[in-house]
Structure formats: structure tokens, C-alpha cells
UniProtKB/Swiss-Prot annotation:
Transfers the 4'-phosphopantetheine moiety from coenzyme A to a Ser of acyl-carrier-protein. Its EC number is 2.7.8.7. GO terms for biological process: fatty acid biosynthetic process. GO terms for molecular function: holo-[acyl-carrier-protein] synthase activity; magnesium ion binding. Keywords: Cytoplasm, Fatty acid biosynthesis, Fatty acid metabolism, Lipid biosynthesis, Lipid metabolism, Magnesium, Metal-binding, Transferase. The lineage of its organism: Bacteria, Pseudomonadati, Spirochaetota, Spirochaetia, Leptospirales. Mg(2+) binds at D8, E57. It is an enzyme of class 2 (transferase). It comes from the Bacteria. It is found in: Cytoplasm. Belongs to the P-Pant transferase superfamily. AcpS family. This is Holo-[acyl-carrier-protein] synthase. The gene is acpS. Coiled coil: none annotated. It comes from Leptospira interrogans serogroup Icterohaemorrhagiae serovar Lai (strain 56601).
Length: 126
């Protein structure tokens, strides 16, 4: 079995600053409609947005797209219950790259603290 791991950590204040500066433009550029809806229904959406941002960055690091390949972050979606197992759903170029590289599955771990959010993505193939 071959695995590829990506991780990311972000200060929640960075995402808060981006949201305050760019508003909906930032949200619509980075998050899918379902992710925006999920996060907006949380008491404090910032840690949830930050965590999802980390998942997207961690996936990009794990997939190693190569030079001059830009992946649309909205095509990397995180689904799952608040305290349950999370699932990564890929679309477009992200899904195509995942399949082309022969990956058969992935695991996601996401965590939030007061000031930071972090995520690890593990891609694997038999």
C-alpha cells in the first residue's frame, strides 16, 4: 500500500481577517455552497471555516498536483456530522487528479482549538 500525507494548520484569526476584509467573495471562492451553509449555522463559524480551509490545503499537499496545476478549493468538499467521521468529496480537476494518480481512498482528521485549526489528509492506494 502506498500513502501520501498532507497536513495544514492555520490561525483562526487569519480566516476571520480574510472574511472581514473580503466577505462573501472570500467564502464563495474557497468554500462550496454546502460548506458555507454548514459553517454559517454554527455558533462561531470561524473555527469550522478554518478547519475546512486546512482540509483543502492538506489535500493539495497530499495529492502533489505539480507545478502550474491550480486546484479549485470548492472542488474539495468536507462532509460529515459535527462530531462524526468526516468524508472528503472531490469534484472536477481534484477528482480527476485523485483517480489519475491511482488513489483508492482517503482519511481526514480535523481539529479546532481556541486559536488554531488543523487537518491531516491521508491518501492511499493498494
Amino acid at each position: 500500500m502506498k500513502i501520501s500525507v498532507g497536513n495544514d494548520i492555520v490561525e483562526n484569526s487569519r480566516i476571520r481577517d480574510l472574511l472581514e476584509k473580503h466577505g462573501d467573495r472570500f467564502l464563495k471562492r474557497v468554500f462550496s455552497e454546502s460548506e458555507r451553509e454548514y459553517c454559517s449555522n454554527r455558533k462561531d463559524p470561524i473555527p469550522h471555516l478554518s478547519g475546512r480551509f486546512c482540509v483543502k490545503e492538506a489535500f493539495i499537499k497530499a495529492i502533489e498536483p505539480g507545478d502550474h496545476v491550480i486546484l479549485d478549493m470548492r472542488e474539495i468538499e468536507l462532509f460529515g456530522k459535527e462530531f462524526g467521521k468526516k468524508e472528503l468529496v472531490l469534484h472536477g480537476k481534484s477528482k480527476e487528479l485523485f483517480l489519475t494518480k491511482g488513489y483508492s481512498g482517503c482519511s481526514v482528521s480535523i481539529s479546532h482549538a481556541e486559536n488554531y485549526s488543523t487537518a491531516v489528509v491521508v491518501l492511499y492506494k493498494e
